[in-house]
Amino acid sequence: MNLRIGVIGTGAIGKEHINRITNKLSGAEITAVTDVNQEAAQQTVQDFNLNASVYPDDDSLLAAENVDAVLVTSWGPAHESSVLKAIQHGKHVFCEKPLATTAEGCMRIVEEEMKTGKRLVQVGFMRRYDSGYVQLKEAIDNRVVGEPLMIHCAHRNPTVASNYSTEMAVVDTLVHEIDVLHWLVNDDYESVQVIYPKKSKNALPHLKDPQMVIIETKGGIVINAEIYVNCKYGYDIQCEIVGEDGIIKLPEPSSISLRKEGKFSTDILMDWQRRFVAAYDVEIQDFIDSIRNKGEVSGPTAWDGYIAAVTTDACVKAQESGQKEPVALQEKPAFYQSFTTVNK
């Protein structure tokens, strides 16, 4: 029997997930949708030819008997409420980042999930499912280059929307590095610092771009993370682990190589969707399979969402202060100690 999934929020990412579940993945079907724009929800059902009910709000969708699990793909500030309600209904929930807009909100979700005694919440940090990052994780865990000492990484976008702010460089962009690097080295963050290099001529007047974030872990690893969201040339994700005995680097996306007219070239992708489309597929399939086979989710946890929130808060404070700021995490509950995302 297919897992019956309800979708809360039928915007761009909601439609992407509806499409992959309906047309690409196995073991699940969309049986319910809701959106603050009811016309948009109705149109989504028609566009994808879904045999799904349209509900007026998340309360009615979560109470529906034809819903086993939910995807929360609504506006970020609405995530916390929907996730808490899903937990209270005993339903597994996949939530796109952010899990909540504050660390306090994430902790409320953590506490609510722990009351159930089982893992119900998975956060949408899809990079853990990217084949390149999985290879990095395996190499680090196997100490192929010894202990990690430093990490150099970059998150570059060709351009961003006019409403993109300096703070968003951390809370919307760097948050992916914050999660995946913590997962790669399995070491909590100790402190963060933000440095502003010379401003690019391509940056909007209100935006400080690029930015460099220095993160130190409790185990002494130093991470420098470049954020450059107006690089123009493409969407470029880089990650290099410097170990005691060598260096390992995130592989480039596969592409044909061209030798022509005295030049050797390969393509650079221009958007994040193409760069991580396969990771999104594996991520949602894992959500489906874990529920059907184990009755619990196995991807990034609510605690991972909390770590990301506390770290981004510290980065925003560092943006404003210009100083090194502590990452003040609470002690990890025993409930989450045994949960790690399995390499895919």
From Swiss-Prot:
Q: Which reaction does it catalyse?
A: myo-inositol + NAD(+) = scyllo-inosose + NADH + H(+); 1D-chiro-inositol + NAD(+) = scyllo-inosine + NADH + H(+)
* Gene Ontology molecular function: inositol 2-dehydrogenase (NAD+) activity; nucleotide binding
Name which cysteines form disulfide bonds.
none
Q: Which GO terms describe its biological process?
A: inositol catabolic process
KW Protein biosynthesis (keyword) present: no
The job of this chain, per UniProt, is described as:
Involved in the oxidation of myo-inositol (MI) and D-chiro-inositol (DCI) to 2-keto-myo-inositol (2KMI or 2-inosose) and 1-keto-D-chiro-inositol (1KDCI), respectively.
**Hey, which family's this protein in?**
Belongs to the Gfo/Idh/MocA family.
Protein name, as recorded: Inositol 2-dehydrogenase/D-chiro-inositol 3-dehydrogenase
Q: Which organism is it from?
A: Bacillus velezensis (strain DSM 23117 / BGSC 10A6 / LMG 26770 / FZB42)
